[in-house]
Amino acid sequence: MKKRIVSIMLAAVLALSLAACGSKDTTEQDVYRQYGINCLESGNYEDAIKAFQNALNQSLGKVGEKEIDICFYKAQAQYLSGAKDDALETYNAIIKYNKDGRAYYLRGNLYYDMGEEKKALADYEEAVKQNKKDYELYIGIYQSMKNHGAKENAQKYLNQALEIKGEKAEDLLYKGQISYLLGDYKTAVTDLTNAKEDGQQKASYYLGLTYEAQGDTDKAQSYIKEYLDSGVATSYELYDLGSSELDDGDYEEALTFFNAGLALEKVPNKQNLMKSAIAAYEYSGDFDSAKTMLKDYLEEYPSDEDAQKESTFLETR
């Protein structure tokens, strides 16, 4: 991921594959990039793809870290728009240009979604080969395999991550999270508590999940509240917390998490948060709030046919 880009020939290949990279006008490139990110976060994937391509077009054939970063965004937008083959082409070009562990991981996820499990697993192996000390990579691979019904085989990646040498607070945070995922709650509590004492606020989040898994609701809620009060919660974590409450039938608490996520400055999963909040309002019987949020949702995501049908249904309530 951090390897220097040295091949002029491969630069030419990537330039052709992605309509050229390298900054001609850094300011203009940054404007296109930021506009693309804004479109991506609002679910306007087609415009995001165009913006990222325009950012890449500000080039003279020279590739740098910024251009690779834009390519990752472009591939994400392509995938979310449903253009999986285009996303695959973009990841192929990145990997051909620079054997990037993150690109192998993301391409592996894409292969899994396309039903090509063998290719996905091969990419995961290459990803950890390139990034042997990246905890998040191991955890991401585990989550992806688990989501595709391969939890037992996926656990080997968590065990590999535990072998990474390091006893700093950040290491303990990741190892505590991994122990939680493996069901080793005693070790998880020990590592996460030490990480928290050394200033890792996110440890409170995983301590909450660990105690919840053990049935200690009071401690779980206490740590989750502490984490929320710290102001470092991400929209993804708030979505997960809200979804858990929604599954348990606590719609008011679910809405607290969903709306807290929507109130953050950066909300890359805004669409999922809004859809879940609408569902929580409906389940709680607050159809007026559901209608209001659904109206806002359709203004941002007008092509969602299911939401359009839901709007028609709510008008009868």
Place the predicted regions along the sequence by residue:
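C-terminal motif of bacterial Sec signal peptides marking the signal peptidase cleavage site
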Residues: 17-20
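Canonical tetratricopeptide repeat
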Residues: 34, 66-69, 73, 80, ...
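Helix-start (N-cap) detector for alpha-helical repeat units in TPR-like alpha-solenoids
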Residues: 29, 68-69, 101-102, 135-136, ...
